[in-house]
From Swiss-Prot:
Coiled coil: none annotated. Catalyzes the transfer of a dimethylallyl group onto the adenine at position 37 in tRNAs that read codons beginning with uridine, leading to the formation of N6-(dimethylallyl)adenosine (i(6)A). Keywords: ATP-binding, Magnesium, Nucleotide-binding, Transferase, tRNA processing. Its cofactor is Mg(2+). The lineage of its organism: Bacteria, Pseudomonadati, Pseudomonadota, Gammaproteobacteria, Enterobacterales. GO terms for molecular function: ATP binding; tRNA dimethylallyltransferase activity. Residues 42-45, 166-170, 247-252, 280-287 are annotated as: Interaction with substrate tRNA. This is tRNA dimethylallyltransferase.
Amino acid sequence: MNDVSKTGLPKAIFLMGPTASGKTALAIRLRQTLPVELISVDSALVYKGMDIGTAKPDAHELSQAPHRLLDIIDPAQAYSAADFRRDALQAMAEIVAAGRIPLLVGGTMLYFKALLEGLSPLPSADPTIRAEIERQAAEQGWDALHRKLQDIDPVAAQRIHPNDPQRLSRALEVFFISGKTLTELTQTSGEALPYQVHQFAIAPASRELLHQRIEQRFHQMLASGFEAEVRALFARGDLHTDMPSVRCVGYRQMWSYLAGEISYDEMVYRGICATRQLAKRQITWLRGWEGVHWLDSEKPEQAYSDVLQVIGAKQQ
């Protein structure tokens, strides 16, 4: 398999999909038969000490197929799409320099988009404006601020849930700083990706099956010690619910349980529901994605063969 395309650009492979869709298993198999190196594209897997609730590949899987961009920051640190793009481009260049092909696998669609299309220059955070937004939220509630965003930027308001204060605050902040909406600014893409990319999306054909998998996996996480993992983070004392790490699906629900805000059963219910909602958002992103080849996760042999056929590799 040639690692340079007919266009003269180096090849890269994107393997995208919702949570619990079998991405990791397929990526590991491809790693065993193709000259590829794996790069994780997941905003939760970057955090150290967050292994069970993120379904991070285990030691055995990583010994078969090492992943770059896993365990690179502490949960107290921030990691943006711009940080990811910088780190992924560096990793891709190193992989190509070694004569291999980058295989990027994960479910953080914003990261894939940032890598593929580049990032528009958004204004830096302004603590004064951020504080004013927080003050208004305390007085009027986040629902009122969501209605305000609907007037300013209806496209962003449709995408951002009223219960997501972090993204809601940022959308308003960008407008108050720049006078331009988040939608306007993000339509101006930055530098495109200098690779010929083969894009794949893997998911079960049935939504019910995906929901069933999500529920099973959440219970497996609990049986594997997820509560103890989050309890250790909770006990640190320097983490709080405004941080992206604590807001990860599953973690924020367990955090609420440990804080005494909800019962154990409610935590399980909310955790499963939140994971299903995440999967729905991921699939919605992918349905609007251009140039993607769909793979059925319930037919792993066929999915594997389809990837090889599209990228022009011989069946192993």
